[in-house]
Amino acid sequence: RNEIWIIPTVGCVNDIAKKMVRDNQDLVKGTIDGLYTFPHPFGCSQTGADHAQTRKLLAALVRHPNAAAVLVLGLGCENLTHEQFLEELGDYDHDRVKFLTCQEVDDEFEAGRKLLEECSAYAAQFEREPIPVSELVVGMKCGGSDGLSGITANPTVGRFSDMMAARGGSTVLTEVPEMFGAEGFLMNRCVNKEVFDKAVNMINGFKNYFISHHEVVYDNPSPGNKQGGITTLEDKSCGCVQKGGTAPIMDVIGYGDPVVTKGLNMLYGPGNDLVSATAMTAAGAHMILFTTGRGTPFGAPAPTLKLATNSQLAERKKGWIDFVAGPIADGETIDDAAKRLLQLVIEVAGGKQTKAEEKGFREISIFKDGVVL
């Protein structure tokens, strides 16, 4: 995508950012695909790891390849200071990234308009051009899963992931708590001992996260999962890991870290749909494949394709679903379904909007662990 993003560094300026988006739609012209902002409640009153994670995640979004230009919007008195954000962001293109601190100007909307005009002029110079599939980074997610998730849609995504790896592309698998009980299927495919050790540490680290909060993992699966036919955590996990296909795991990356290795990557993140999809976007995913048996409307900042595990859902929720894996239950091969999916991914990479994009459904959620001041 060739978009302009407004990234609030603190929740206090969310409404300012949203008004800027409403008031400046005339700047979306030429090859620019849209002007968007991603509100969140954080950036202040956070300590320790939470503060660091918010800073890291927002800086990663600023670097996202779908954002041709970015306005970073702050208040001025928040914990996440301008200086801290610059330190986290590192070297950046001053033509591409602009900063505005609302307390430092008389009229933040007038000042914001001027900066967004500069963003628009910068973004408008880019034109769509052909690139190989090997340049794509695709996130893989499941949510609202049902009994067919591990039979139709998830194996299709897994086969797609293998096809991407064979073509030199990159895929990202997360939802660590939904690997519990089936993690061996993944760890046995780590490309070397270093990656294996990172995978073990990631899995054990998330288990310790549950233990530190005196929580058990068996609150998963959700009521909707059970209504859809999933009975146990292991049942759900065996379906979840199907999205990883059979290719070697080339790297394991932390929350907020970028994908730097071609092939299949594992990413530290929870099962929660919004949090994990945001983490995959921050890792650099150009788009996200989201399998679902129950249905969900949400979209991440990156184009989010909904893959229905069953044909009934696709028929009932036409406004949500981009791809139907249900025909597999009637005899279509997973190979054929994966080829259909690859073609759709290429079309979306080429500019075709997902159902969530058509409706303007885009949001983020940041991983939180500690106290709020």
Where in the sequence are the language-model features?
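Metallocofactor- and cofactor-centric catalytic cores in central/energy metabolism, strongly enriched
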Residues: R1-M287, R294-L373
